Design a protein with these regions (language model features):
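Juxtamembrane intracellular "pre-TM" segments in multi-pass secondary transporters
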Residues: 2-13, 198-235, 346-349, 466-476
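Residue-level signature of mid-helix packing/kink "hotspots" within the transmembrane helices
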Residues: 35, 63-71, 121, 155-156, ...
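Extracytoplasmic gate region of multi-pass secondary transporters
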Residues: 37-38, 229-283, 287-288, 374, ...
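Helix-breaking motifs and short loop linkers at transmembrane-helix boundaries and internal kinks
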Residues: 49, 81, 102-108, 119, ...
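Conserved MFS/SLC helix-loop-helix module at the cytosolic interface between two early adjacent transmembrane helices
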Residues: 68-106
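Structural signature of the two symmetry-related core transmembrane helices
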Residues: 84-98, 304-321
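Cytoplasmic helix-loop-helix junction between adjacent transmembrane helices
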Residues: 112-152
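Helix-loop-helix hairpin linking two adjacent transmembrane segments in secondary transporters
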Residues: 147-196
Length: 479
């Protein structure tokens, strides 16, 4: 083999660690970009003289377009140089986010958010394909939990920064997120590019010998992806699950409205509601535990990951319902104060106000249970697909997710607006959110079906990779 000479540290343990850190940071930043505007609905709608429902429609459109573009990004990532695609995609969303910060009208903001959406799809599908090549099947759930956690923390951080910096100027947090995205995109150029199937046990001899894994997707292979039954169930579950997950993007607004209903001004309500929404999402940290449990169950049975996901999804529903309707009676904070003053006051309320504590513990339980979904879904997509198919299948799953999330996002806002005729805020938002939790029920059914089909699909993938290790060029014996 010939090629450009690399320094001795290239591809070493430290370089791989730095690569993963940079890569995970990029994943968190793109989710911060998605989460920022929903946390600033009140100041954005006031500044641009538009309605909360209009902001909801725009947010849903961004989610849907990002999901649509993720299919194309994923397909081309499975065919070509993934590093170039990730770099270009990151610069696109960073540019769109930066220009969004200077929008003076709703139309301008909508236009630049469409540009943002076009770039966000790259991190979703191409990023998944890359990270799956750094992870062995034995520890996929645990490793993917960190990937999913980074995305979740990015959303929390983006929402927190937006609610605090954006209460007075919605452009400030958008500029910050955009500049960080562009900076880490440049750092990504110096990271290690893992070959496809880098951690697959069946391909270790191939990679150790310096042989390339030559297989790439083409259009003719796409029908075969749908003939793999587990793929169908994994894609279908995303549509229903994301109706419910998409509605949850309005939880910060629900709590901002709860604070406003106590008589606080918009700026204080935005900051306090944003702080509470960030604190109440700590249950997502349990995804690490859920991923490890999924790995352990998968070693016992090839149905293990799907079973863990089904139990988590269905078990979370009653906790979400309580969480939405818990009032914030007796919450006392300093009106007009800065974040530095409000944060300790909110934390104090967690231990002294029973209503606030009830909201915290029910959200903790709900999010801890649903945290089983993300890492085990990621791991299952990798388990039942060949390395050159994973970005495309993830893109298709992400499209299904995006359709469901966009619909859940927009319809929850519309439903809450309709309920407001009879129910004052925040009760209209609580009812709207509660209605959409019913979509977790078909999600549980899809995972139950995947538990039956995944063992056969996993064995098929393992057999193909073993043949390809022996006959790298064709995957089949000569003759």
């Amino acid at each position: 083999m010939t090629g450009r000479r690399r320094p001795t540290w290239w591809g070493g343990r430290i370089h791989l660690t730095v690569t993963i850190v940079v890569f995970v940071t990029l994943a968190s930043l793109d989710n911060a970009a998605i989460a920022a505007i929903p946390q600033m609905v009140l100041p954005v709608s006031a500044a641009l003289h538009t309605s909360e429902t209009a902001i909801g429609v725009m947010t849903a459109t961004v989610i849907l377009l990002a999901a649509l573009t993720a299919v194309a990004w994923g397909y081309w990532g499975d065919r070509s140089d993934r590093k170039r695609l990730l770099f270009g995609g990151t610069l696109v969303w960073a540019l769109g986010t930066f220009l969004s910060a200077g929008a003076g009208t709703y139309r301008e903001l909508f236009t630049w958010q469409i540009v943002t959406a076009a770039g966000l799809g790259a991190i979703a599908s191409v990023g998944f394909s890359v990270i799956s090549d750094f992870v062995s099947p034995r520890h996929r759930g645990l490793a993917m939990s960190f990937w999913g956690l980074a995305e979740g923390l990015g959303a929390v951080a983006g929402g927190l920064v937006a609610s605090q910096l954006g209460a007075d100027d919605f452009g400030a947090p958008l500029r910050l997120i955009a500049l960080l995205g562009a900076g880490f995109a440049v750092l990504y150029l110096f990271t290690f590019s893992a070959p496809r199937g880098f951690r697959e046990p069946a391909l270790q001899r191939l990679h150790q010998a310096g042989e390339p894994y030559p297989h790439r997707i083409d259009v003719a292979q796409i029908p075969a992806l749908f003939r793999r039954r587990t793929n169908l169930w994994l894609i279908a579950q995303g549509l229903s699950a994301q109706f419910a997950y998409g509605s949850l993007i309005w939880v910060p607004l629900l709590y901002q409205e709860k604070v406003a209903a106590l008589g606080y001004d918009v700026e204080t309500a935005t900051r306090v509601g944003g702080l509470m929404a960030a604190i109440l999402r700590l249950g997502g940290l349990f995804s690490i535990v859920a991923g490890a449990i999924g790995d352990r169950m998968q070693r016992r049975s090839l149905s293990g990951r799907a079973v863990v996901s089904a139990v988590g999804i269905l078990g979370a529903v009653p906790f979400f319902l309580v969480f939405f309707f818990v009032p914030l009676r007796g919450l006392e904070v300093t009106s007009g104060a800065s974040t530095a003053t409000l944060l300790p006051e909110v934390l104090h309320a967690l231990v002294t106000n029973g209503w606030v504590a009830a909201a915290f513990f029910t959200s903790l339980a709900a999010l801890a249970l649903t945290s089983a979904d993300s890492p085990n879904w990621f791991a299952l997509v990798s388990d039942v697909n060949l390395p050159e198919h994973r970005g495309t299948v993830f893109g298709l799953g992400n499209l299904s997710n995006g359709v469901g999330r966009a619909a859940g996002n927009a319809l929850t806002a519309a439903a809450a607006g309709g309920f407001e005729r009879a129910l004052p805020p925040p009760l209209n938002w609580a009812v709207g959110l509660a209605v959409f939790q019913v979509f977790f029920l078909p999600t549980g059914y899809c995972y139950a079906r995947a538990a039956r089909t995944s063992p056969g699909d996993i064995r098929e993938v393992e057999a193909i990779l073993q043949r390809r290790a022996k006959y790298p060029r064709s995957g089949d014996p000569p003759g």
